């Protein structure tokens, strides 16, 4: 197994490598004067199971291009299998046509990553589950619920004792699209959910119209 890090989150890649008792593959990732991305692996990856850790976060376009160039480099270096580890999947919010003459960019990005040579995708809490269907390769959409549940439990002081009366807990979804995620958290803590009803008058702006649900006096 070989783990390779892009520039988007080298610290995360290092922690993953340490957890797996592995070393990061050294790589030269540079930018030419005209802005082009250049990649060279400094270790043999032939026949290896390669994991490329590169969330496509800000700057999204640069991170995405770097991921694709690294994936292509691994493929042309004869890696046996290439897994793109993308904790944050950029363009995920563009998963459908928002108007008559707009693209479905999440699908385009999926096509680009597959064409670059990825055999498998590892991501976390996709904005919309249907994005998994945009790929023609396996996609593992991991959840952060187990990690966050420990902090939530500690923060609100939940006690594992059915005889102790506790203040109600409510999980608020910021929009209709997050209801399923909020419901899963609520089920874990036997809580309720609330939904923020909002509208987007223009790109990048939202207005809260209503709060659906009861949050008074609750965590």
Name each model-derived stretch.
Residues 1-219:
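PRPP-associated nucleotide enzymes
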């Amino acid at each position: 197994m070989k783990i390779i890090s892009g520039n988007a989150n080298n610290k995360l890649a290092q922690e993953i490598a340490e957890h797996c008792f592995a070393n990061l593959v050294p790589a030269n990732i540079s930018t030419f004067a005209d802005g082009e991305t250049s990649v060279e692996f400094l270790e043999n990856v032939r026949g290896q199971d390669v994991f490329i850790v590169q969330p496509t976060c800000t700057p999204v376009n640069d991170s995405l291009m770097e991921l694709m160039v690294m994936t292509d480099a691994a493929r042309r270096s004869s890696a046996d299998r290439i897994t793109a580890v993308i904790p944050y999947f950029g363009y995920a919010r563009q998963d459908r046509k928002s108007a008559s003459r707009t693209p479905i960019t999440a699908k385009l990005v999926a096509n680009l990553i597959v064409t670059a040579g990825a055999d498998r995708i590892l991501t976390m809490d996709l904005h919309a589950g249907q994005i998994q269907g945009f790929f023609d390769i396996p996609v593992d959409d991991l959840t952060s619920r187990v990690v966050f549940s420990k902090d939530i439990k500690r923060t609100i002081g939940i006690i594992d004792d059915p005889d102790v009366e506790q203040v109600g807990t409510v999980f608020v979804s910021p929009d209709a699209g997050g209801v399923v995620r909020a419901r899963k958290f609520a089920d874990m803590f036997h809580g309720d959910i609330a939904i923020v009803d909002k509208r987007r008058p223009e790109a990048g702006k939202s207005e809260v119209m209503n709060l659906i649900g009861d949050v008074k006096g609750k965590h």
